[in-house]
């Protein structure tokens, strides 16, 4: 049975428990066995992590032993997928730059706080994740992130909506959802869902998340079928 590991915790304001339960249900419906943990100790064994098809992060504003991040990095490098949303992934561990390097971005602001009305614009391309999806409105936090230029952007939103010091710059399209690779592993991120009910109010947000998680998990099968190794990525030089 293909397995998914979800670890949830951190700041309760992002409702990690209901969000992780939602993601677990979506992946079970897709045919995966799901394990949900409320402790980071599930990340202690890198070889066990590498057996999963997908790791889902749902942990905001936390601290983590760097060894655990290295374990996730090891597993993803071997082909395990990594996915998450909102602050549960890209504001999970502010002090760990390897985590930010692996995930592709870091939250820095949500101008205006919660309850901001904005549009999510789907960027159609080669990714199956966005096929058939249309632009959709969201009322939630409007996430401004610092992002890795290597990401493949799947959806964007226009800034500024709320005036602040950043609005003296030209209008920009901020990535909302993206994919990238980490070694042989696939990484998916979606900045939506300050609260769990965002996925109910904007069903396309949930569909985007479901497709992204499945896409990331399917990378494990590809790595196994093609006997991919990590030799070309390994380096003992100082990285951080």
Language-model features: locations:
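Extracellular ligand-binding/catalytic regions of CAZymes and related secreted enzymes
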Residues: 2-3, 29-30, 168-174, 182-240
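Helical hinge/lid and interdomain linker segments adjacent to catalytic or ligand-binding clefts
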Residues: 3-6, 12-92
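Hydrophobic residues at beta-strand termini and immediately following loops
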Residues: 7, 37, 156, 190
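Short, solvent-exposed loop/turn segments at secondary-structure junctions
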Residues: 11-12, 62, 89-91, 158-161, ...
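Catalytic beta-strand/loop cores that center a nucleophilic Ser/Cys/Thr
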Residues: 28, 51, 108, 113-184, ...
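A glycine-rich, often tryptophan-bearing local segment used as a flexible ligand/cofactor-contacting loop or short
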Residues: 63-132
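Proline-centered loop/turn at the N-terminus of a beta-strand
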Residues: 81-83, 152, 186
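Oxidoreductase and adenylate-handling cofactor-binding alpha/beta cores
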Residues: 99-107, 136-152, 192-193, 206-220
């Amino acid at each position: 049975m293909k397995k998914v590991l979800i670890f949830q915790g951190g700041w309760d304001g992002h409702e990690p428990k209901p969000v992780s339960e939602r993601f677990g249900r979506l992946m079970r419906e897709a045919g995966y066995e799901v394990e949900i943990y409320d402790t980071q100790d599930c990340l202690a064994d890198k070889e066990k992590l590498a057996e999963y098809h997908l790791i889902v992060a749902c942990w905001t504003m936390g601290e983590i032993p760097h060894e655990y991040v290295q374990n996730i990095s090891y597993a993803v490098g071997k082909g395990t997928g990594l996915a998450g949303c909102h602050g549960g992934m890209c504001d999970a561990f502010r002090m760990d730059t390897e985590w930010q390097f692996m995930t592709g971005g870091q939250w820095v602001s949500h101008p205006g706080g919660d309850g901001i009305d904005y549009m999510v614009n789907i960027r159609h391309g080669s990714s199956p994740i966005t096929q058939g999806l249309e632009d959709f409105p969201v009322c939630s936090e409007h996430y401004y992130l610092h992002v890795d230029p290597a990401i493949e952007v799947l959806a964007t939103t226009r800034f500024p909506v709320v005036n602040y010091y950043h609005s003296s710059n030209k209008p920009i399209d901020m990535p909302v959802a993206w994919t990238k690779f980490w070694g042989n592993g696939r990484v998916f991120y979606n900045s939506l869902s300050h609260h769990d009910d965002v996925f109910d109010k904007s069903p396309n947000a949930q569909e985007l998340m479901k497709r992204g998680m499945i896409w990331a998990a399917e990378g494990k099968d590809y790595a196994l079928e093609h006997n991919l190794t990590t030799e070309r990525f390994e380096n003992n030089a100082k990285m951080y």
